[in-house]
Amino acid sequence: MSDYMINSMQFLYLVASYLFGNILTAYIVTKWRHNVDIRDEGSGNPGARNMGRVYGKGYFVATFLGDAIKGAIVVSIAKYLFEDSTFVMLTLLAVIIGHIYPVLFKGKGGKGISTFIGGLIAFDYLIALTLVAVFIIFYLIFKGFTKPGLITIACLPLCMILYSYSIVTTILSALIIVLILYVNRE
Protein backbone atom coordinates (compact mmCIF):
# COMPACT_ATOMS: atom_id res chain seq x y z
CA MET A 1 0.00 0.00 0.00
CA SER A 2 2.30 2.72 -1.24
CA ASP A 3 1.96 5.96 0.72
CA TYR A 4 -0.92 4.30 2.59
CA MET A 5 -3.48 5.22 -0.05
CA ILE A 6 -6.00 2.65 -1.15
CA ASN A 7 -7.16 2.07 -4.69
CA SER A 8 -10.72 1.36 -5.83
CA MET A 9 -10.30 -2.42 -5.66
CA GLN A 10 -9.02 -2.17 -2.09
CA PHE A 11 -11.88 0.16 -1.17
CA LEU A 12 -14.41 -2.33 -2.57
CA TYR A 13 -12.69 -5.13 -0.66
CA LEU A 14 -12.96 -3.12 2.57
CA VAL A 15 -16.69 -2.59 1.98
CA ALA A 16 -17.10 -6.31 1.21
CA SER A 17 -15.14 -7.16 4.39
CA TYR A 18 -17.45 -4.99 6.46
CA LEU A 19 -20.54 -6.57 4.87
CA PHE A 20 -19.12 -10.08 5.34
CA GLY A 21 -18.72 -9.18 9.01
CA ASN A 22 -22.50 -8.60 9.08
CA ILE A 23 -23.02 -12.37 8.81
CA LEU A 24 -23.74 -13.32 12.42
CA THR A 25 -23.27 -17.04 13.02
CA ALA A 26 -25.36 -17.02 16.21
CA TYR A 27 -28.30 -15.40 14.44
CA ILE A 28 -28.18 -17.85 11.53
CA VAL A 29 -27.85 -20.92 13.77
CA THR A 30 -30.70 -19.97 16.12
CA LYS A 31 -33.00 -18.99 13.26
CA TRP A 32 -32.25 -22.29 11.51
CA ARG A 33 -32.39 -24.58 14.55
CA HIS A 34 -34.93 -22.87 16.83
CA ASN A 35 -36.64 -20.20 14.69
CA VAL A 36 -35.74 -17.52 17.26
CA ASP A 37 -33.49 -14.46 17.27
CA ILE A 38 -30.57 -14.95 19.69
CA ARG A 39 -30.66 -11.20 20.30
CA ASP A 40 -33.90 -11.84 22.21
CA GLU A 41 -32.34 -14.62 24.32
CA GLY A 42 -29.99 -14.55 27.32
CA SER A 43 -27.81 -11.44 27.31
CA GLY A 44 -29.12 -10.49 23.88
CA ASN A 45 -25.64 -10.63 22.37
CA PRO A 46 -25.34 -12.61 19.12
CA GLY A 47 -22.01 -14.14 20.07
CA ALA A 48 -20.45 -17.41 21.14
CA ARG A 49 -20.61 -16.75 24.87
CA ASN A 50 -24.36 -16.05 24.87
CA MET A 51 -24.95 -19.06 22.62
CA GLY A 52 -23.08 -21.24 25.10
CA ARG A 53 -25.05 -19.91 28.04
CA VAL A 54 -28.43 -20.27 26.33
CA TYR A 55 -27.98 -23.45 24.24
CA GLY A 56 -24.83 -25.21 25.51
CA LYS A 57 -21.22 -25.92 24.57
CA GLY A 58 -21.94 -27.23 21.09
CA TYR A 59 -23.59 -23.95 20.13
CA PHE A 60 -20.70 -22.02 21.69
CA VAL A 61 -18.21 -23.97 19.57
CA ALA A 62 -20.27 -23.65 16.37
CA THR A 63 -20.68 -19.91 16.84
CA PHE A 64 -17.05 -19.36 17.78
CA LEU A 65 -15.85 -21.31 14.75
CA GLY A 66 -18.29 -19.63 12.37
CA ASP A 67 -17.28 -16.14 13.46
CA ALA A 68 -13.56 -17.02 13.60
CA ILE A 69 -13.66 -18.52 10.11
CA LYS A 70 -15.34 -15.33 8.89
CA GLY A 71 -12.36 -13.28 10.10
CA ALA A 72 -9.87 -15.80 8.71
CA ILE A 73 -11.50 -15.81 5.26
CA VAL A 74 -11.39 -12.02 4.94
CA VAL A 75 -7.76 -11.82 6.05
CA SER A 76 -6.60 -14.80 3.97
CA ILE A 77 -8.12 -13.43 0.78
CA ALA A 78 -6.67 -9.98 1.50
CA LYS A 79 -3.20 -11.49 2.03
CA TYR A 80 -3.48 -13.33 -1.27
CA LEU A 81 -4.85 -10.41 -3.30
CA PHE A 82 -2.99 -7.46 -1.81
CA GLU A 83 0.03 -8.83 0.14
CA ASP A 84 0.38 -5.60 2.14
CA SER A 85 0.24 -6.19 5.89
CA THR A 86 -1.13 -2.72 6.62
CA PHE A 87 -4.03 -3.19 4.24
CA VAL A 88 -4.62 -6.72 5.52
CA MET A 89 -4.86 -5.38 9.09
CA LEU A 90 -7.31 -2.76 7.80
CA THR A 91 -9.49 -5.55 6.38
CA LEU A 92 -9.43 -7.27 9.77
CA LEU A 93 -10.64 -4.03 11.33
CA ALA A 94 -13.40 -3.79 8.69
CA VAL A 95 -14.72 -7.33 9.26
CA ILE A 96 -14.66 -6.81 13.04
CA ILE A 97 -16.56 -3.52 12.72
CA GLY A 98 -19.04 -5.34 10.47
CA HIS A 99 -19.50 -7.99 13.15
CA ILE A 100 -19.90 -5.51 16.01
CA TYR A 101 -21.96 -2.88 14.17
CA PRO A 102 -23.74 -4.76 11.37
CA VAL A 103 -25.86 -2.50 9.18
CA LEU A 104 -28.02 -5.54 8.34
CA PHE A 105 -28.93 -5.88 12.04
CA LYS A 106 -29.33 -2.17 12.86
CA GLY A 107 -25.93 -2.01 14.54
CA LYS A 108 -26.61 -4.78 17.07
CA GLY A 109 -23.86 -7.32 16.58
CA GLY A 110 -21.45 -9.41 18.60
CA LYS A 111 -18.40 -8.35 20.56
CA GLY A 112 -15.86 -9.23 17.88
CA ILE A 113 -13.54 -11.54 19.80
CA SER A 114 -14.11 -14.71 17.74
CA THR A 115 -13.79 -12.78 14.47
CA PHE A 116 -10.62 -11.13 15.80
CA ILE A 117 -9.09 -14.47 16.80
CA GLY A 118 -9.74 -16.10 13.43
CA GLY A 119 -8.48 -13.08 11.54
CA LEU A 120 -5.37 -12.81 13.69
CA ILE A 121 -4.47 -16.47 13.15
CA ALA A 122 -4.73 -15.91 9.40
CA PHE A 123 -2.80 -12.62 9.64
CA ASP A 124 0.22 -14.05 11.48
CA TYR A 125 0.06 -17.39 13.25
CA LEU A 126 3.29 -16.65 15.16
CA ILE A 127 1.70 -13.62 16.79
CA ALA A 128 -1.34 -15.76 17.55
CA LEU A 129 0.86 -18.42 19.18
CA THR A 130 2.68 -15.77 21.20
CA LEU A 131 -0.65 -14.45 22.45
CA VAL A 132 -1.76 -18.00 23.35
CA ALA A 133 1.33 -18.24 25.59
CA VAL A 134 0.44 -14.88 27.17
CA PHE A 135 -3.13 -16.08 27.69
CA ILE A 136 -1.97 -19.28 29.42
CA ILE A 137 0.20 -17.30 31.82
CA PHE A 138 -2.65 -14.95 32.75
CA TYR A 139 -5.15 -17.81 32.89
CA LEU A 140 -2.99 -19.51 35.53
CA ILE A 141 -2.94 -16.26 37.51
CA PHE A 142 -6.65 -15.31 37.25
CA LYS A 143 -8.27 -18.79 36.86
CA GLY A 144 -10.87 -17.46 34.42
CA PHE A 145 -11.26 -16.51 30.78
CA THR A 146 -12.44 -12.91 30.64
CA LYS A 147 -9.57 -11.01 32.31
CA PRO A 148 -6.80 -13.14 30.76
CA GLY A 149 -8.48 -12.84 27.37
CA LEU A 150 -8.76 -9.07 27.49
CA ILE A 151 -5.21 -8.67 28.84
CA THR A 152 -3.94 -10.94 26.08
CA ILE A 153 -5.75 -8.99 23.38
CA ALA A 154 -4.25 -5.77 24.77
CA CYS A 155 -0.77 -7.26 24.18
CA LEU A 156 -1.26 -7.37 20.39
CA PRO A 157 0.44 -4.03 19.61
CA LEU A 158 3.52 -5.14 21.58
CA CYS A 159 3.63 -8.33 19.52
CA MET A 160 3.31 -6.29 16.32
CA ILE A 161 6.39 -4.31 17.35
CA LEU A 162 8.22 -7.48 18.44
CA TYR A 163 7.55 -9.08 15.04
CA SER A 164 8.72 -5.92 13.18
CA TYR A 165 5.46 -4.72 11.64
CA SER A 166 5.24 -1.10 10.51
CA ILE A 167 4.05 1.62 12.84
CA VAL A 168 0.88 2.09 10.75
CA THR A 169 0.04 -1.62 10.96
CA THR A 170 0.74 -1.54 14.70
CA ILE A 171 -1.53 1.49 15.13
CA LEU A 172 -4.31 -0.31 13.23
CA SER A 173 -3.89 -3.30 15.55
CA ALA A 174 -4.16 -0.93 18.52
CA LEU A 175 -7.38 0.52 17.07
CA ILE A 176 -8.80 -3.01 16.86
CA ILE A 177 -7.86 -3.57 20.50
CA VAL A 178 -9.43 -0.29 21.63
CA LEU A 179 -12.63 -1.21 19.78
CA ILE A 180 -12.79 -4.71 21.27
CA LEU A 181 -12.01 -3.48 24.77
CA TYR A 182 -14.66 -0.77 24.38
CA VAL A 183 -17.43 -3.19 23.39
CA ASN A 184 -16.36 -5.63 26.13
CA ARG A 185 -16.08 -2.97 28.85
CA GLU A 186 -18.91 -4.16 31.13
Curated annotation (Swiss-Prot):
GO terms for molecular function: acyl-phosphate glycerol-3-phosphate acyltransferase activity. It is a multi-pass membrane protein. It catalyses: an acyl phosphate + sn-glycerol 3-phosphate = a 1-acyl-sn-glycero-3-phosphate + phosphate. The keyword Transmembrane applies. Its main location: membrane. The chain crosses the membrane at residues 9-29, 58-78, 85-105, 121-141, 161-181. Pathway: Lipid metabolism; phospholipid metabolism. It holds the Pfam family G3P_acyltransf. It is found in: Cell membrane. The keyword Transmembrane helix applies. One of its GO terms (biological process) is phospholipid biosynthetic process. Belongs to the PlsY family. Probably interacts with PlsX. Catalyzes the transfer of an acyl group from acyl-phosphate (acyl-PO(4)) to glycerol-3-phosphate (G3P) to form lysophosphatidic acid (LPA). This enzyme utilizes acyl-phosphate as fatty acyl donor, but not acyl-CoA or acyl-ACP. This is Glycerol-3-phosphate acyltransferase 1. It comes from Bacillus cereus (strain ZK / E33L).
